Amino acid sequence: MAGSVNKVILVGNLGKDPEIRRTQDGRPIANLSIATSETWRDKNSGERKEKTEWHRVVIFNEGLCKVAEQYLKKGAKVYIEGALQTRKWTDQSGVEKYSTEVVLQGFNSTLTMLDGRGGGGGGSFGEEPGGDFGSSGPVSSAPRRAVAAGGGGRNSDMDDDIPF
């Protein structure tokens, strides 16, 4: 293989409102905590079990930070695409620590609100090919959706059925 791939795709719910902070030169950084869950039936008891995994997500893309700040709230369902990165840092007592995070930065990052604004549809935000590096706007995604303008309930045909 000529190269390698570092791509993470998550669909989950925000565990808390996004934390927005700014660099010294004023650029925003958004931190998200996303929960993904899997459920199964225990073979012995027949009892339904669930395991939740928590993921740290850091957004360095200014446009995506604005979307996170304005529209994302605790409990919101999101689809994200980013890269897995591990960083090393030293805590206050001098102990070296490591954090592994999903990073949304640059061109290969996507943030899609699956709940939509106001409950209907969803909105997709990411880097448009050939666009400005820091800009972000609605882009087409696999299930083509426009940014929701608000209102409306969930579509009944959007259940868990796969269209093929």
From Swiss-Prot:
The keyword DNA repair applies. Residues 5-111 form the SSB domain. GO terms for biological process: DNA recombination; DNA repair; DNA replication. PROSITE patterns: SSB. Pfam families: SSB. InterPro entries: NA-bd_OB-fold, Primosome_PriB/ssb, ssDNA-bd. Residues 54-60 bind DNA. Residues 135-148 have a biased composition (Low complexity). GO terms for molecular function: enzyme activator activity; single-stranded DNA binding. Keywords: DNA damage, DNA recombination, DNA repair, DNA replication, DNA-binding. Signal peptide: none annotated. GO terms for cellular component: nucleoid. Residues 118-164 are annotated as: Disordered. A motif (Important for interaction with partner proteins) lies at residues 159-164. Homotetramer. Plays an important role in DNA replication, recombination and repair. Binds to ssDNA and to an array of partner proteins to recruit them to their sites of action during DNA metabolism. This is Single-stranded DNA-binding protein.
